[in-house]
Amino acid sequence: MKTNYILALSGNDIFSGGGLHADLTTYTVHKLHGFVAVTCLTAMTEKGFEVFPTDSTIFAHQLTSLKNVPFSAIKIGLLPNVEIAEQALEVIQAHQDIPVVLDPV
């Protein structure tokens, strides 16, 4: 069954120019329904632009919450560490019949 449901595995861009904000905006413009599992948060600190990965257990809970949604495509954004990348791979392997877009940061 084809739906207009798109899953983004994306980070939160504090400036809203990219990441999950840009993903959801793009989906809305194209009349798609976007879902997001947040891979990380970002911030501008005294050290500069920093990435704070989502705890892998929390990320897993997000993915479990979405496991029964019939997605038509998956978009992969910022993967901040190996654990999150491995979980993203599991999602891809579970959805081999739909397109996957990799948008590396």
Map each language-model feature to its residues.
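Small-residue (G/A/S/T)-rich helix-start motifs and N-terminal tracts that mark the onset
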Residues: 1-73
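Glycine-rich phosphate/dinucleotide-binding loop and adjoining beta-alpha-beta core of small-molecule
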Residues: 49-105
